[in-house]
Amino acid sequence: VNSPSGARGQLDYLDQAGLELLRATERGQLVQGVWVYKHPLDSDGLAAFHQRVGAGLLGRLIERSPLPFARPHWVTREGPQVDIITAEHPRPPAELMDWADELATRPIDPEFGPGWLLAVQPLTDGTTAVSFVVSHCLVDGGGAIVAVWDAILGNRRDFGYLPPRSRGRIAAAASDLRATVREVPNLVKGLSAVARVAARGVTSARKSGAAPPDPAGDDATVVIIPSAVAIVDSETWDARAAALGGNNFSLAAGYAARVAEHLGRTRASDGSVSLILAGSGRTGLDDDRALAMTFATAVIDPSGVTQDLTAIRNAARAARAKVATEPDASLGLLPLVPWFPQPMAKAFASEMFAYDDAPPVSCSNMGDLPDDIARVDGTT
């Protein structure tokens, strides 16, 4: 098991930060996949997938330490956590994304469960949709693909996690206290990062003005954010990217920048877009981190991306290189997140996405996926 944090089963700093920010902000991030089958669904095959996918990266939940400042651990929770949710009545294909959005409002929790769910929706044109929804605190996009792929192929990964509540409170507290003492050097480094981040925060606040109101407030309601789905033939996509002097990734980034421009999410100073490029930091199939991710910020001029992708390709490459040599100072605060009171945790979340005078725009690209990823019911 690759646990960069050290101890087996202990959450990585970024994973723990994700959990703490979930609790502080009450905004849960999810990963969702949708498949549409044009032929009859193999119900037995999907049931077998449902049994197998609840292993490895998805066969777990988070268990808190008895000590409020100590790091949580992964514990086993293998097998389905809820039954497959099968709709009784078909819906029009035009409502496919409405259905997907509705699934995302169901209770999903990485600590108390269920951490993930699987659902089926017949459509009135004879096709059938399948959706898989999982807490982002359990896996990122790359981890979800690994989990789904393993379940389809019948692979099983054992990360050696303990059963829930198996350590005993006294033994767990003693073990976690020793682990916390060993992490004192990391805490000291975190404290040294506070001044750097505070200075940057003052600068960002001056540029961006007052913080936007918290959309949750005291009377939080579910807000469905508008979305759109486009299906483009991969050969057409690659050909267009090549014609513009780019590649599959830079065309996606250019498209995101152009959409951002249309939505008015540009910098007031020069009309450029602050594009957050999410990348995978996963070191292999046995890397058990939930959030094995890297984030690079590229400043993009959206006006020329429809003629030439060279600039955006170079900007993205430079942004990723900078992340490798100059890590974001905010990441140095991760060891301190468990010690933050909730208001400070919320401020930390805002600081992580403070980008001068521009609202951030995210762009994720999972790349080319294996053909097997389409066979959640065992058929193609």
Walk through the language-model features, giving the residues of each.
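N-terminal alpha-helical "arm" segments
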Residues: 2-25
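Soluble acyl-CoA-dependent acyltransferase catalytic core bearing the H(X)4D motif
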Residues: 2-10, 34-44, 48-55, 59, ...
